[in-house]
A protein has these predicted regions:
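Short, surface-exposed ligand-recognition loops at beta-strand->loop->(often short) alpha-helix junctions
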Residues: 8-20
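Short, low-order "capping/linker" segments at domain edges
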Residues: 92-102
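Generic alpha-helix initiation/capping and coil-helix boundary signal
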Residues: 18, 28, 45-47
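A general secondary-structure junction signal
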Residues: 42, 90-93
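An amphipathic, aromatic/His-enriched active-site/gating alpha helix that lines ligand/cofactor pockets
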Residues: 23-36, 55-90
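Short, well-ordered beta-strand segments in beta-rich or mixed alpha/beta enzyme
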Residues: 2-9, 39-70
Length: 102
């Protein structure tokens, strides 16, 4: 299962600052049962916009995560709420179809 969201930096906050904090929070979140990693992709032509993809074993695993268990993760998420526009794009199944090349 993939949880995908777009992140746009507000004025005065950089992608690098976001990514540094995101990596720190991800280290804690990845200790959650069912967590399978996260990826950040910078949007071509819009360097202050990222696509984030969180990989989970299932929707139930993601729904069960508790970000409040870590004061540091909670603080990072609260800061991101002030410094970024975060737009959830949705929850997606694993790929059903794949093209060639990988």
């Amino acid at each position: 299962m993939k949880y995908i969201f777009e992140v746009r930096m507000k004025d005065g906050y950089t992608v690098e600052e976001y990514a540094e904090a995101w990596i720190e929070a991800s280290r804690v979140i990845q200790q959650t049962p069912g967590a399978r990693g996260t990826d950040l992709h910078r949007k071509i032509g819009e360097p202050d916009t990222l696509l984030a993809i969180a990989h989970w074993d299932s929707k139930a695993h993601r729904d069960a995560k508790d970000d409040s268990r870590s004061a540091r993760v909670k603080a990072i998420l609260e800061k991101h709420a002030r410094t970024c526009e975060i737009t959830p794009l949705g929850e997606f199944e694993e790929p059903e179809w794949r093209g060639g090349g990988r």
